[in-house]
Design a protein with these regions (language model features):
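Hydrophobic beta-strand signal
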Residues: 131-132, 258, 309, 334, ...
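Flexible, acidic/glycine-enriched loop-and-adjacent beta/alpha segments
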Residues: 311-341, 354-368, 374-381
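Cleft-lining beta-strand/loop regions that shape enzyme active-site pockets
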Residues: 23-35, 39-56, 79, 109-112, ...
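PDZ/PDZ-like peptide-tail recognition elements
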Residues: 62, 74-112
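Conserved functional hotspot residues or short segments at active or partner-binding sites
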Residues: 347-348, 352-530
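An acidic helix/loop motif centered on a single conserved Asp/Glu
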Residues: 54-71
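Structural motif
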Residues: 127-129
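Bacterial Sec-dependent N-terminal signal peptides
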Residues: 1-32
Length: 530
């Protein structure tokens, strides 16, 4: 739990960006009495007079970070390398060879080549092991994942030579791959969950999210979709514009989606244009404690405009807007310049103490310990945080995330301590990869269609036994039979979903997992009863 919380708090996807020139309207005052002058003199003195050699770059970067840490939890500085990685995840593409992979025992195992990507074009297959890149061994040499990715990626049009080991073939295979633009998808999956109801899960809000979303919507409409479950669970946010585009699809012309306002930044409103394709039909939005930022904008807009019902648990509570300020070396500062407000006037930013990032990162852990994730009765808001939706005048709250209309507790029967430990040690995923490596060809032949797989495939007991045995070997065991039984129900569903992902894609993964999801099942119940 703590690892995921810290990761979420630090993730770049928590940021909402203003699309404005980085240095626009910035004023620089280096007069004799300016605090900036003092900072400049200190840096010059240290660089020229300090007793030992000084890393000037690091000194300045640490100084910037130190200043930002005193402001708020979301004003941050990233190096050029970190900024480049962030932009790739949000801009929708990067240059590379186009494979989904996992590391298995210090070897890169191809899960799936990207459809129509450079690796698929030359014949690289799921299950292939890449052992060398341009004659440099990457298998069995303790090379970091980051270093391997650096070697595989490169400018579009450049070539990279790969050495591959393929199951059933004794000799090594050699491929020359021409790098190309590889899309980074932000829609995790979509499918018809019931005859008239579609399901779309958005993982983050990037430059291509709206295009991906409309592709899914149009395909689902052709299959008879009238209602939609929009899954924003674990969505850390992203681009403000993408959130506005998605919300626009559901709302009437002139409906307020969100507005922003800061000390210097004037009030800026974003209204629906009235050209959306989802203005009719029932909508349910799924959220949890890891739903943040741009995802909360969409959720708040649909809730405040009484366009959709929100199901799940209280969202993260990130209501600050960052403006990117680029530095000449490619690094970037993201400075909080405004708050954002939902249509009813809610600022859903949760409280924070300036300069105390650790306390902020522990807030979700406090919810967990306080019992909020299991009971809505443990959540209390001051009357000053009470607001009302714009059409039906239902009570909603600000100041700490978005409260769902229907609360669904975290399922402790599924997420046992035993299962968390197995996952933490990578025992489940590692043995799933080994199983697929040995059985991929047979499974694809036996189940050419996902519907057959979903209806008839059962995870073999031998795979379960292998996982339990490996856990025991690493001193990971259930505390009693009851915990084991609860774990096995979820573990079987998880393994079936992972195998489906390997054979097909993420949409099939979620089709399996959603059969076990209490949040999804509650949404379906509400749709049937409304």
């Amino acid at each position: 739990m703590m690892k995921k919380i810290t990761s979420l708090c630090s993730t770049i996807l928590l940021l909402i960006f203003f699309a404005v020139p980085s240095h626009a309207q910035l004023k620089l005052d280096l007069g004799r009495t300016s605090p900036l002058r003092k900072l400049q003199i200190a840096e010059i003195a240290i660089s020229n007079l300090y007793v030992d050699s000084v890393n000037q770059q690091k000194l300045v970067e640490d100084g910037i970070r130190g200043m930002l840490e005193k402001l708020d939890p979301h004003s941050t500085y990233t190096t050029a390398k970190e900024t480049k990685a962030m932009n790739e995840s949000l801009n929708g593409s990067f240059d590379g060879i186009g494979v989904q992979f996992n590391m298995q025992e210090d070897t890169l195992l191809v899960i799936q080549p990207v459809a129509k990507g450079p690796s698929e074009k030359v014949g690289i297959l799921p299950g292939d092991r890449i052992i060398a890149v341009n004659d440099t061994a990457i298998a069995g040499v303790k090379m970091s994942r980051e270093e391997i990715m650096r070697r595989l990626r490169g400018p579009k049009g450049t070539k990279v030579n790969l050495t591959i080991v393929r199951r059933g073939i004794a000799e090594k295979l050699h491929f020359t791959v021409v790098r190309d633009k590889i899309p980074v998808k932000t829609i995790d999956g979509w499918y018809m969950i019931e005859p008239a109801t579609g399901y779309i899960r958005i993982g983050s809000f990037g430059a291509t999210t709206y295009e991906e979303f409309m592709t899914a919507v149009n395909a689902l409409k052709k299959q008879g979709m009238k209602n939609l479950i929009l899954d924003l669970q674990d969505n850390g946010g992203g681009y403000l514009q993408a959130a506005v585009q998605i919300a626009n699809e559901f709302l009437q012309k002139g409906d307020l989606i969100v507005y922003t306002k800061g000390r210097v930044a004037p009030r800026s409103e974003f209204d629906a244009q009235g050209n959306g394709t989802l203005k009719d039909g029932k909508v349910i939005v799924l959220v949890n404690e890891f739903t943040a930022s741009a995802a909360e904008i969409v959720t708040g807009a649909l809730q405040d405009q009484d366009r959709g019902i929100v199901v799940g648990r209280r969202t993260f509570g990130k209501g600050l807007v960052q403006r990117p300020i680029d530095f000449p070396d490619g690094s970037m500062m993201r400075l909080t310049v405004a708050h954002y407000y939902t249509p009813s006037g809610r600022n859903i930013q949760k409280p924070y103490v300036k300069g105390d990032l650790k306390d902020y990162e522990l807030e979700l852990d406090k919810r967990f310990k306080h019992g909020e994730l299991y009971s809505a009765d443990s959540i209390h808001f001051a009357d000053s945080l009470k607001f009302y939706t714009l059409r039906k005048h239902r009570t909603v709250y600000g100041g700490g995330g978005i409260m769902p209309d229907y609360f669904v507790p975290l399922d402790t029967l599924q997420f046992t301590a035993f299962h968390r430990k197995l996952m933490a040690k990578n025992i489940v995923l590692d043995n799933d990869l080994k199983y697929m490596d040995a059985n991929r060809k047979q499974l694809k032949a036996k189940y050419p269609h996902f519907t057959d797989y979903l209806a008839h495939y059962t995870v073999p007991q031998s795979l379960i036994d292998t996982i339990l045995a490996e856990g025991k070997k690493q001193k990971i065991e259930p505390k009693d039979k009851a915990e084991l039984d609860r774990t096995l129900v979820y573990l079987r569903a998880q393994l079936k979903a992972l195998i489906a992902r390997d054979i097909w894609d993420m949409s099939e993964y979620f089709q399996v997992m959603n059969e076990q999801s209490h949040v999804v099942q509650r949404a379906l119940e509400l749709l049937r009863s409304r």
